[in-house]
């Protein structure tokens, strides 16, 4: 079952979306902060802990994607054994500035309750320099609880979204 607002929906990745996702581009200022969508699909093939989620527009066309990761890697970001790690969030460059990021993240609670009912939190790491992403995550309910870690290109803020059952 898909989670949707009428305008967008979140769905688990299927091969039928691959061709469109591989055409995604990102502006240069965003590339440093997230994974290339094609690379994410490749990594997820060999890593069963990376659950790729596709963001579809109202026509069912992929406009973005992200991963919800389970397993040991999550514990690098939180002590919560029942948390998921959100990684590799991106919206195709030519579909940005249309509200897809905010709308898709607003569906995250419902998606996690449906597909990961035993999980009670989503965590993510956002670079301190990536102010637009920090603001977006705060708007949809993620909280900065003061945890920091060093990432590949600098200090990262660990943000937490409690999943309310």
Segments from the language model and where they lie:
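Conserved acetyl-CoA pyrophosphate-binding loop and the N-cap/start of the following alpha-helix
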Residues: 95, 99-107
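Conserved beta-strand-loop-alpha-helix junction that forms the acyl-donor binding cleft
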Residues: 118-134, 150-155, 162-163
């Amino acid at each position: 079952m898909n989670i949707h607002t009428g305008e967008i929906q979140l769905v688990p990745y299927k091969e039928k979306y691959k061709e469109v996702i591989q055409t995604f581009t990102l502006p240069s200022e965003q590339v440093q902060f997230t994974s290339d969508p094609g690379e994410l699909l490749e990594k997820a093939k060999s890593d069963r802990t990376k659950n790729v989620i596709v963001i579809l527009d109202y026509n069912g066309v992929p406009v973005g994607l992200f991963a919800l990761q389970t397993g040991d890697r999550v514990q690098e970001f939180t002590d919560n054994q029942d948390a998921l790690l959100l990684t590799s969030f991106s919206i195709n460059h030519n579909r940005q500035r249309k509200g897809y990021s905010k709308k898709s993240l607003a569906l995250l609670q419902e998606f996690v309750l449906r597909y990961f009912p035993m999980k009670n939190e989503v965590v993510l790491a956002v670079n301190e320099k990536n102010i637009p992403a920090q603001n977006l995550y705060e708007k949809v309910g993620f909280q900065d609880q003061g945890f920091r870690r060093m990432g590949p290109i600098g200090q990262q803020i660990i943000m937490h979204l409690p999943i309310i059952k």
